[in-house]
Amino acid sequence: MDIYMSRYEEITQQLIFSPKTWLITGVAGFIGSNLLEKLLKLNQVVIGLDNFSTGHQYNLDEVKTLVSTEQWSRFCFIEGDIRDLTTCEQVMKGVDHVLHQAALGSVPRSIVDPITTNATNITGFLNILHAAKNAQVQSFTYAASSSTYGDHPALPKVEENIGNPLSPYAVTKYVNEIYAQVYARTYGFKTIGLRYFNVFGRRQDPNGAYAAVIPKWTAAMLKGDDVYINGDGETSRDFCYIDNVIQMNILSALAKDSAKDNIYNVAVGDRTTLNELSGYIYDELNLIHHIDKLSIKYREFRSGDVRHSQADVTKAIDLLKYRPNIKIREGLRLSMPWYVRFLKG
């Protein structure tokens, strides 16, 4: 028997029979909309908050087509901004579990616009954290980031060992962790921070200047455009499929008190180079949609990027019974049909 997945299955069954009320911030985004889909399919009541700065209405529209009419009726969407404390207080009424995903992501974006990144990721986080504490919610899980490891050279990355931040974005996500720790010590309000490592999957936006590498390259291949690799292509990352992230959010929300007031890596524990990744995407895409050729162009390394990233997920496995069951190749295979539909119509 797979004890790790049985814990996740046990929790999801428990939720079906005893529904809770959830708040998802950033609900119209990539991760937020996937959490929404999963929770509605578990017959949960969900309040969603988004200001559409990076999220999209079409993500919510898609979720609506994937759940029943009754399940969709349990969803209440509020268009609002986490930078407004009053909004955060209003959406928190009656909430059991908070999944805080709203943020301005992207290292390059934070270098171009550190002021807005700070306002959203630090002030916005503090507003949601404070409102949740005052509302006495049962759990508060927030999206942290692997960027917090900064220039620390050790591999794999262990939660306790971090270096100096390499971008304004990394600073904001680290400040989130510090605030969470202070709220636990000062107010007894315990949270769980999830350090995401290069999450990918369905509904990850391929458009825009700050698109992540997998959707950006997938779109380029489908259009017959060049694939641009920053540096020599030997930069490596621990790519984590969206279903692993959903699992960790739900495990965290229903975690025992002894596992709270903690930070956990959310990844697979593997390392894939950009050169390998481009080949994997090409292979998986070609299985369902013919690609004439793969044209790769190399350019300068990107400012603020770390050379290698790989997570140690032992802590999540031990304390939360996490099981990163979907690896990079399977995750890409599951993702490609969505991208073909989205980009080819």
From Swiss-Prot:
Q: Kindly list the biological process annotations in GO that this record carries.
A: O antigen biosynthetic process
Whether NAD counts among this entry's keywords is yes
Q: Which residues cross the membrane?
A: none
Keywords for this protein? Carbohydrate metabolism, Isomerase, NAD, Nucleotide-binding
Positions annotated to bind substrate: 145-146, 196-198, 213-216, 228-230, 237, 302-305
Q: How does activity depend on temperature?
A: Optimum temperature is 37 degrees Celsius.
Question: Which pathway does it serve?
Answer: Bacterial outer membrane biogenesis; LPS O-antigen biosynthesis
Q: What class of enzyme is it?
A: isomerase
According to the record, how does the cofactor bind? Answer: Binds 1 NAD(+) per subunit.
Noted pH dependence of activity:
Optimum pH is 7.0-9.0.
What's the impact of mutating S236G? No effect on epimerase activity
Single GO MF annotation? nucleotide binding
Q: Which reaction does it catalyse?
A: UDP-N-acetyl-alpha-D-glucosamine = UDP-N-acetyl-alpha-D-galactosamine
| EC numbers on record | 5.1.3.7
- Keyword Ribosomal protein recorded: no
Q: Name one Pfam family in it.
A: Epimerase
Instruction: Tell me which domain of life the UniProt entry assigns to the organism this sequence originates from.
Output: Bacteria
Please report any disulfide bonds recorded for this protein chain, giving both cysteine positions.
none
Which residues are involved in binding NAD(+)? 26-31, 50-55, 81-82, 101-103, 120, 169, 173, 199
Q: Which cofactor does it need?
A: NAD(+)
Q: Which PANTHER family match?
A: BIFUNCTIONAL POLYMYXIN RESISTANCE PROTEIN ARNA, UDP-D-APIOSE_UDP-D-XYLOSE SYNTHASE 2
Function of the molecule: Catalyzes the epimerization of UDP-N-acetylglucosamine (UDP-GlcNAc) to UDP-N-acetylgalactosamine (UDP-GalNAc). Has very low epimerase activity with UDP-Glc and UDP-Gal. Plays a role in the biosynthesis of 2-acetamino-2-deoxy-L-altruronic acid, a building block of the O-antigen in bacterial lipopolysaccharide (LPS).
Please state which protein family the record places this protein in: Belongs to the NAD(P)-dependent epimerase/dehydratase family.
Query: What does the subunit section of this Swiss-Prot or TrEMBL entry state?
Result: Homodimer.
User: What name appears for this protein in its UniProt entry?
Assistant: UDP-N-acetylglucosamine 4-epimerase
Q: Which organism is it from?
A: Plesiomonas shigelloides (Aeromonas shigelloides)
